[in-house]
Amino acid sequence: ITPLIDKIAEFIIAFHQSKVLDNVMKDSYSIVSNLPYNISTPILFHLFEYLDIIQDMHFMLQKEVVDRMIAAPSSPEYGRLSVMLQYYFAMEHLVHVPKESFDPEPKVESSFVRLIPYEHYPFVANNIEQFGRIVKEAFSQRRKTIRNTLKSFISENDFQKIGINPQL
């Protein structure tokens, strides 16, 4: 059954990447889904392209993914997923769904979450692609100092100008 699940996951990603929806979706939509847990993150990132037609989204996801989505800065769960989703969406953890709620019982806990695209972003990223690259790089090597991780984007002098300790 695993090869079948992999094929379904590939189809979902290929469908999302095909831009088929571009000509069909003209209004504002609510999306409700039990996303396949193994491909939920790429799907969430892909949905950034459709913010202008998304009213809100409700997803059943693996609990650990929801924990990362809504994580606060400085928490162990806080990372790229947190930063990017919190830039685009107000999020609300609606309910925890214990694994005992399913038959057969899965190995993981689930959570139901609501995402509402911001009308006005919490801050302005002048170049969203560059912002995404910086966030990705910043969380790719957590054990390195921020100076070493982001040296291709920001000089040590610039860190000092904006009041960030480059030794963090």
What do these predicted ranges mean?
Residues I1-E129, R133, Q160:
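Catalytic cores of RNA-modifying enzymes
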Residues V135-L168:
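C-terminal lobe and adjacent flexible extensions of AdoMet/dcAdoMet transferase-like proteins
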